[in-house]
């Protein structure tokens, strides 16, 4: 994931090396094929081919040739541009379905820069109504330009509950990403996390969940940011996140815990996305917002009590799953009372098969792809607590 402006060569090499000599597909909605020569011959990484497809309209999402190239790619790269084009052209079409299938079944490498990074999280700023500045977002978190989206789109490992942001230093976008997180918590009750990159900076996430940060520090002040609500607090919601009034998210000046990493040419500084509590080479900060202004201070490392093994007295009078046993088609889950934030379908070895965000409804329908015979578990997540 790159924050925009020009690409970082070492980070792009990291991406290409994980294509294992295969085919790279660049998808974009504007521009040309400038990535082809750069990826294929200028970085010294042996790959079979690079092809750029420019999707000029939603019609391209139904082009069999586009589908074929997605199915044959070992790596897919989303160029910069306008993320609303990507969302409106590809979401709920064969394009996002085939990309997600390639991620889950073939373990392809996926990445993007600028708008291409912005679409990789489970939550995303869709830019349907244009961009928004930090000052405008914090002045009114419900301005139409704060268009935070949770509709299922791309399912990238380790990014399910993450919203990304880019060009973080040009202009300063801390305030708007904090506003995105405040809206997600206020509207959906989900404590999402944020990953952000300055320009010329990249975050590369391995299959082990370790994020390496590339940049040109100390020559340039290139940063990545890993942002989360402060799990040490009993009350974590914003003090004020309403229509027409400035955002207040202070919580005694400790509302958000942030790990800041300087990006280096070797990518030696890291953050662990498995726990969101451990990093190497960075520093912890507190972020908070008072009357529409972002403030920060030094902080100790975050200390979260493990909660995924806790029990909870759920407000559920009845809980039904059918059909059981399940063969093919859809699984219906019904529950009376408080609906979960997330539903997770997983195999007995813990492998996650399907994840759906559920903002407090009373039933849901899961439609998993073909599954091998076996026993599967359904887990309901309430904040940080999971009931299986």
Task: Spell out what each predicted region is.
Residues 69, 92-106:
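Catalytic-core regions built around general acid/base machinery
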Residues 1-79:
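N-terminal beta1-alpha1 cap of cysteine-dependent amidohydrolase-like domains
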Residues 92-97, 124-136:
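A glycine- and small-aliphatic-rich helix-loop capping segment at beta-alpha/alpha-beta transitions
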Residues 79-80, 103-124:
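Catalytic nucleophile loop
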Residues 313-388:
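C-terminal outer-membrane/trafficking sorting elements
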Residues 83-93:
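Glycine/threonine-rich flexible loop motifs
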Residues 1-21, 132-306:
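C-terminal and late-domain segments of enzyme folds
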């Amino acid at each position: 994931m790159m924050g925009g402006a020009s690409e970082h060569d070492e980070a792009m090499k990291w991406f290409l090396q994980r294509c294992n000599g295969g085919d790279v597909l660049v998808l974009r909605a504007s521009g040309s094929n400038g990535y082809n020569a750069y990826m294929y011959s200028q970085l010294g990484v042996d790959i079979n081919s690079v092809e750029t497809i420019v999707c000029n309209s939603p019609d391209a999402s139904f082009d069999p040739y586009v589908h074929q190239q997605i199915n044959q790619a070992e790596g897919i790269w989303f160029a910069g541009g306008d993320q609303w084009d990507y969302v409106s052209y590809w979401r709920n079409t064969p394009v996002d379905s085939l990309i997600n299938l390639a991620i889950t079944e073939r373990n392809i490498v996926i990445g993007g820069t600028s708008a291409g990074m912005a679409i990789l999280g489970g939550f995303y700023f869709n830019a349907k109504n244009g961009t928004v500045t930090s000052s405008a977002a914090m002045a009114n978190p419900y301005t139409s330009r704060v268009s935070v989206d949770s509709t299922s789109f791309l399912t990238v490992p380790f990014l399910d509950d993450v919203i990304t942001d880019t060009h973080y230093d040009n202009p300063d976008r801390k305030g708007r990403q904090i506003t995105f997180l405040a809206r997600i918590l206020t509207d959906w009750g989900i404590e999402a996390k944020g990953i952000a990159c300055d320009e010329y900076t990249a975050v590369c996430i391995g299959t082990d969940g370790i994020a390496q940060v590339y940049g040109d520090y100390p020559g340039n002040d290139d940063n990545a940011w890993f942002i989360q609500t402060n799990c040490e607090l009993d009350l974590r919601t914003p003090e004020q996140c309403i229509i027409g009034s400035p955002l207040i998210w202070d919580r005694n000046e400790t509302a958000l815990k942030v790990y800041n990493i300087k990006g280096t040419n070797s990518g030696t500084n890291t953050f662990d996305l498995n726990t969101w509590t451990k990093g190497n080479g960075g520093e912890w900060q507190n972020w908070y917002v008072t009357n529409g202004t972002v403030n920060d201070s030094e902080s100790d490392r975050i200390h979260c009590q493990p909660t995924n093994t806790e029990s909870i007295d759920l407000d559920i009078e009845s809980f039904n799953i059918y059909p059981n046993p399940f063969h093919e088609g859809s699984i219906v889950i019904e529950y009376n009372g408080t609906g979960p934030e997330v539903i997770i379908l997983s195999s007995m070895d813990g492998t996650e098969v399907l994840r759906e965000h559920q903002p407090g409804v009373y039933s849901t329908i899961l439609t998993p792809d073909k599954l091998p015979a076996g026993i599967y578990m359904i887990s309901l997540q309430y904040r940080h607590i999971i009931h299986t």
